Amino acid sequence: MAFQCQRDCYMQEFDSCVVSCVPAELKLENNGRKEKLTGFNVKLKDTILFPEGGGQPDDHGTIGGVPVLRVLRQGPDAVHFVSSALEEGQEVHIKLDWERRFDHMQQHSGQHLITALADTMFGYKTTSWDLGRQRSSIELDTATVKPGEMEALETAVNEKIRAHVPVTVNLLSIDDPAVEKVRSRGLPDDHAGPIRIIDIEGVDANMCCGTHVSNLSHLQVIKILGTEKGKKNKTNLIFIAGNRVLKYAEKSYNIEKSLTVLLKTGADEHVDAVDKLQKTVKRLQKSNLTILREMAVLIAQNFKSKPDRGHFFSLHNKDGDNEFMNIVANEIGFQDTLIFMTVGDEKGAGLFLIAGPENIVTEVGPRVSELLQGKGAGKAGRYQGKANSLVKRAEVEALLKERSYKCTAGDE
């Protein structure tokens, strides 16, 4: 069965009828967090909302004013997930999120065009593709591409766009001999009905369920951003098409303007300016590390030179690191001195180190880790780790100081 969205990819509003509405759950991932939503699966007599398939994401839109959160294909049906129930038999008005749909059409038709010409020009077969949110990728069945090939391919695809090549949809029966001549990666196991062929006149005929432009001129332009190493003996071609190219150009220009202000150089000198800055930063970091190490030694020597230094040492250094803390601890020696050190933001996250008599460190380590909302581990008289909050540093210091006094009193 072909849906209305496949018969007319440019239709943005449509009236249909609710065939069924049943309670359902939808699992979503929002900013890396998994969510489970309760709602309803709705089947319509027909739909202009494309169900996910053929490498193309589903459409967004509304049914009777109710937002559609997901559209999936189940056999010959499109299942729309909505948050509110709709009555069976109810006549409903469907509105399509056209900006999202047209973007998908541009990327998908762009993929067909690139796939066809990469094959005819260089013999590179497409094994899979991915329509991403910001850029798309085509997996080519080749370990490497030769210099100049992607530039030639980009020129060729944009020549076809400027030539206003028509794109048509043909429906063939599964036993039609013409089916054997089209590009295909196979049909879903639950496919029913005629075979849908996307025909780019004189360029390609490809079996596909997705939504496509009616003329290559609607792609506007294709930019091949480059290639990346893919799976074994594969190469990923990265591209953007249509409005994404305009957004990419706008974003790139805004970044260029900002860098010009920050670097105080023209765009042609940005790379050299950043290279010089990186070398300067690397040199300063090396110098800073040397100073920090020397300071650690001096801090330890200063503590050891005090006749009344006692058996407890505590220090916080905002700019230190694990190496800094360990240098101080090693210089002081922790066989008979309990050492507590932290680095980082005093009211935020950081690192901590406890060093001293092994029995004491083993006893207090987990408690210190708990107070600093962190995680640590230790052995041989050291316990160190990451602190998610150093707010209770003073409380930890008091705890360790008291423990060191008890130990000293016990020894005496």
Swiss-Prot record:
UniProt subcellular location: Cytoplasm
Q: Which organism is it from?
A: Danio rerio
Main location, first listed in the record: cytoplasm
**Protein name (record):** Alanyl-tRNA editing protein Aarsd1
The cofactor note from the UniProt entry for this protein is:
Binds 1 zinc ion per subunit.
Family matches, as SMART domains: tRNA_SAD
* UniProt record, GO biological process: regulation of translational fidelity; translation; tRNA aminoacylation
Q: Which family does it belong to?
A: Belongs to the class-II aminoacyl-tRNA synthetase family. Alax-L subfamily.
